């Protein structure tokens, strides 16, 4: 890994824009050499932290946490290890390694906190998700990591992207299954055909991007099938943004409100597009220099043709949250969303429908601990 942001730059960027919530993205952030120190530093700044991950290294990071805690309070951790062994979430050799304590006692670990979320990427049930990520077994590892995280008291969210061929009934089944596992919230967002994604798809996979990504019309058609989800599932998007996705209202883009900082600087104008100077040395300079009125869709007209099909949360969710295109009743909707009773969906999930890919032959329906009525 040659191109990584120094830890000090990461922490100073968070302080510079003073965002209440920081999403650590990648690539895969868990291979960042100082990920534990970064999470610790952001928490010391009193920020909510989301670690966006494919979950391949989650269980390893949680075992490192257990090793530290076992040294401090073995009597409390021993029963947890027993549960993890019974659930086959750690192996006997991994449990013994935990009992030996941390390899480096000075190294911080990622501990459970109500202000930190594992944000696990899941784009469908087993078969579809493994196809999208081009690797068998990834879905299964995601579920194992989620189960382990909930046993240990972590907050867990999931992030799902909807594409042209996505079956919304499948996503509904996924959300119900994840609710049964105790997942704390879900982000569901439309797949947008930004330039880098289109180039990668055509070059690496030989796929026509227009057959994969959503137009604005496609997005509304897809999400209109899911109007009830906001009341049924613990969605992390505001009700106003969900109404936008379902075609029941219009919003404008506020890309400046969820800025992206990478190794080159503050990316402008947004997570998807890079224009003008491309990257700025400071957040303030980016805010002042970018002509924000040149982007987004206003009254059905795209200010920039590349924005025509974008309805993603990083541009439009802040508009909804900040009330920038507000209507009577929006404030009350957001108050209820933030402080009202949260949905608690229950229902039996047929595990053969969930594990419908590489693990189908394992007959997961014989594992009743995965389901609660």
PLM features: residue spans?
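Conserved alpha-helical substructure of the radical SAM core
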Residues: 1-115, 323
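Short secondary-structure transition/capping segments
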Residues: 15-16, 35, 62-65, 169-171, ...
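Short, acidic/turn-prone active-site loops that include or flank metal/cofactor-
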Residues: 54-56, 123-125, 328-330
């Amino acid at each position: 890994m040659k191109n990584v942001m120094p830890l000090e730059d990461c922490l100073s960027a968070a302080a510079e824009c003073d965002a209440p919530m920081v999403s650590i993205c990648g690539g895969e952030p868990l291979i960042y050499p100082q990920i534990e120190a970064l999470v610790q530093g952001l928490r010391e700044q009193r920020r909510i932290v989301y670690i966006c991950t494919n979950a391949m290294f989650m269980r390893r990071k949680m075992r490192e946490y257990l090793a530290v805690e076992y040294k401090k309070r073995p009597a409390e951790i021993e029963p947890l290890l027993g549960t993890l062994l019974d659930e086959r979430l750690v192996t006997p050799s991994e449990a013994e390694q935990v009992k030996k304590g941390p390899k480096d006692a000075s190294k911080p670990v990622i501990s459970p906190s109500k202000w930190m979320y594992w944000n696990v990427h899941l784009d469908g049930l087993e078969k579809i998700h493994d196809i999208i990520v081009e690797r068998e077994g990834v879905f299964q590892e995601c579920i194992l990591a989620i189960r382990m995280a909930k046993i240990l008291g972590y907050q867990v969210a999931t992030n799902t992207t909807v594409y042209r061929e996505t079956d919304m009934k499948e996503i509904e089944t996924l959300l119900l299954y994840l609710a049964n596992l105790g997942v704390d919230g879900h982000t569901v967002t439309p797949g947008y055909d930004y330039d880098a994604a289109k180039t990668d798809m055509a070059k690496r996979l030989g796929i026509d991007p227009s057959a994969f990504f959503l137009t604005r019309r496609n997005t509304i058609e897809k999400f209109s099938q899911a109007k009830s989800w906001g009341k049924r599932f613990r969605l992390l998007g505001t009700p106003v943004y969900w109404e936008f996705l379902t075609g029941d209202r219009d919003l404008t883009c506020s890309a400046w409100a969820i800025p992206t900082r990478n190794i080159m600087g503050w990316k402008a104008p947004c997570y998807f597009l890079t224009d003008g100077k491309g990257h700025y040395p400071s957040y303030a300079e980016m805010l002042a220099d970018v002509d924000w009125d040149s982007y987004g869709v206003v009254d059905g007209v795209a200010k920039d043709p590349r924005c025509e099909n974008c309805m993603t949360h990083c541009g439009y969710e802040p508009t909804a949250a900040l009330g920038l295109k507000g209507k009577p009743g929006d404030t009350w909707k957001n108050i209820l969303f933030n402080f009202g009773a949260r949905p608690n969906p229950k229902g039996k999930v047929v595990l053969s429908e969930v594990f419908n890919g590489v693990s189908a032959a394992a007959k997961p329906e014989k594992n009743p601990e995965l389901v609660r009525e």
